[in-house]
Amino acid sequence: MFPSTNQEVLALLPEAYAPFDPIVDVLPIIPLLFLLLAFVWQASVKFR
């Protein structure tokens, strides 16, 4: 019925988002950075 099916649209998404691949690779690390930041902050206030 429609010329472009869902499969065709989904197949094009990785190509469209290819420039963002380096950013996506770094995203899972961000929460770990917040965890490390908490320790650095507590060390700076001497864990009071």
Curated annotation (Swiss-Prot):
Residues 1-11 form a propeptide. Keywords: Chloroplast, Membrane, Photosynthesis, Photosystem II, Plastid, Reaction center, Thylakoid, Transmembrane, Transmembrane helix. InterPro entries: PSII_PsbK, PSII_PsbK_sf. One of its GO terms (biological process) is photosynthesis. It is found in: Plastid, Chloroplast thylakoid membrane. It is a single-pass membrane protein. The keyword Cytoplasm does not apply. The chain crosses the membrane at residues 23-43. One of its GO terms (cellular component) is chloroplast thylakoid membrane. One of the components of the core complex of photosystem II (PSII). PSII is a light-driven water:plastoquinone oxidoreductase that uses light energy to abstract electrons from H(2)O, generating O(2) and a proton gradient subsequently used for ATP formation. It consists of a core antenna complex that captures photons, and an electron transfer chain that converts photonic excitation into a charge separation. Belongs to the PsbK family. PANTHER family: PHOTOSYSTEM II REACTION CENTER PROTEIN K, PTHR35325. PSII is composed of 1 copy each of membrane proteins PsbA, PsbB, PsbC, PsbD, PsbE, PsbF, PsbH, PsbI, PsbJ, PsbK, PsbL, PsbM, PsbT, PsbY, PsbZ, Psb30/Ycf12, at least 3 peripheral proteins of the oxygen-evolving complex and a large number of cofactors. It forms dimeric complexes. This is Photosystem II reaction center protein K.
